């Protein structure tokens, strides 16, 4: 058995969002009061209030799986519940 100590490192939310921005990772954002829709696109800017500038944004209907291209948008941080890397489409 190994005697190595496992170090747990806390990742700050701003660092993760910045990594998504730097790596141009396609992300999905869950909306606060609308569970039937999510937004997918690329983060190209954000601020300390988690207001996000989103490029190539698409609105995804979770019931029908339909997609609506909406382009570049500014999403207020108050509307964001969760941000994660979007799954690659097959």
From Swiss-Prot:
InterPro entries: LSM_dom_sf, Sm, Sm_dom_euk/arc, snRNP-E. Coiled coil: none annotated. Keywords: Cytoplasm, mRNA processing, mRNA splicing, Nucleus, Ribonucleoprotein, RNA-binding, Spliceosome. GO terms for biological process: spliceosomal snRNP assembly. Belongs to the snRNP Sm proteins family. PANTHER family: SMALL NUCLEAR RIBONUCLEOPROTEIN E (PTHR11193). Its main location: nucleus. It holds the Pfam family LSM. This is Probable small nuclear ribonucleoprotein E. It comes from Caenorhabditis elegans.
